Amino acid sequence: MKKAYEIFRSELDSIKEAGTYKDERIITTPQKARIDTTVAKGVLNMCANNYLGLSNNPEVIAAAKASYDEWGFGLSSVRFICGTQQIHKQLERKIADFLGMDDCILYTSCFDANGGLFETLLGAEDAIISDELNHASIIDGVRLCKAKRFRYKNNNMEDLKAQLEAAKDCRIKVIATDGVFSMDGFIANLPAICDLADEYGALVMVDDSHAVGFIF
């Protein structure tokens, strides 16, 4: 055990020396445009996903407080045992209607959703054609499943077509893309992607974490 700790310590020291060690930013105020941290005051927050300001919206906060009185705090179970309450189904219905979809499922984070999606739906006879700049959660989710993997250049429809051609004999084909690529701000060419999906009989999976309610 001591040897393992020594290895971990050496690895951490190397990461720190390389300047790639990640320290948490500790925020001492609610999420908003300007925040305070333990090392600075009045910082302009440019890295949150609070695009619509819902985290500090008074109506949202009041509704959350009221929900505790009506529904209690916490699920007390996983969803499929006894952790699904009527309010969850109501929210799923509202989200599905907003997106124009048949149904939806709530996850605690998009990372969890992407991690569980592909393995659930796809097997060894299937294929995932993934944009090279997709979020790490999509990449990790793809790695967890047994489907064949194809990667196309970012937003490059000619390369996507070539990868679809290479995967044409697979049973189920899924094109996976970010809607808005979070690290670069590029917007996926969804009309062209969907046209190619129709041409090759593929499904389209879009991670729209950075677009829903904001870009459309």
Ranges and model annotations:
Residues 6, 10, 14-73, 202:
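N-terminal "arm"/small-domain region of PLP-dependent enzymes with the aminotransferase-like
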Residues 50, 150, 154-206:
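Active-site phosphate-binding strand-loop segment of PLP-dependent enzymes
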Residues 62-110:
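Conserved N-terminal alpha-helix of the aminotransferase class I/II PLP-enzyme fold
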Residues 117-136:
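Conserved PLP-anchoring active-site segment centered on the Schiff-base-forming lysine
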Residues 120, 138-145:
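Active-site-proximal loop->helix
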Residues 124, 145-146, 200:
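Short, structured coil segments at secondary-structure junctions
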Residues 133, 180, 208-210:
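Conserved Walker B
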